[in-house]
Design a protein with these regions (language model features):
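Phosphate/Mg2+-binding loops and adjacent switch elements
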Residues: 1-32, 36
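P-loop NTP-binding site
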Residues: 32-33, 38, 42-178
Length: 178
């Protein structure tokens, strides 16, 4: 059984969902240590998006989420509007919306092969937004040519409680090493 379980992104998840995950973990392993992890989101240049119309994407497609870090970054940055790209999507991207109807007002991630990049480029250029917020780990601006700036939303793991991950690792190693 696990010694430690990390529940990540607790700062953006619903409290009830985090509690349910915690209950499921302790039901299976009552002695497990649980560490809450956070995912602070930062825009490379928040002033570029403030009070502007933005397109969010490419971002989450699988996993049942209707939005991801880029959407959260947009709402926190006080953008004027998040443009729904569905009306501007080329057929390849429109097919993704049909396959994953849970996707909200975001441009879905579908891959980075040449045809997929071309579909992404055309859809972005068609969408009447001032700027794109991209939360994908890839540097999208280096792969496609678009008629609006691309601002990256970045996130990483952060601890928010004591004991922290290092403390738990020391405890674990002390318990198993002679």
């Amino acid at each position: 059984m696990a010694y430690l379980v990390i529940i990540s992104k607790v700062d953006v998840a619903a409290i009830a969902d985090v509690q349910k995950v915690r209950e499921n973990i302790t039901e299976i392993n009552p002695e497990v240590k649980i560490l809450m992890g956070y995912s602070p989101i930062e825009l490379d240049d928040p002033e570029v998006v403030r009070d502007h119309c933005v397109l969010v994407g490419p971002t989450t497609t699988h996993g049942g989420m209707s939005y991801g870090a880029g959407y959260i970054a947009a709402t926190r940055a006080n953008v004027a509007e998040i443009i729904d790209p569905r009306n501007y999507a080329v057929p390849e991207i429109a097919a993704v919306y049909e396959l994953y109807p849970h996707i909200g007002k975001i441009l879905p991630a579908m891959g980075y092969f040449p045809a997929q990049l071309a579909a992404l480029e055309t859809t972005i250029n068609r969408t009447p937004a001032d700027v794109v917020i991209s939360a994908t780990p890839i540097d999208l601006a280096s792969l496609i040519k678009v008629n609006k700036p691309i601002i990256r939303a970045r996130y990483e793991f952060a601890e928010g409680e004591d004991p922290g991950l290092g403390d738990y690792l020391k405890q674990f190693l002390t318990s198993i090493l002679p």
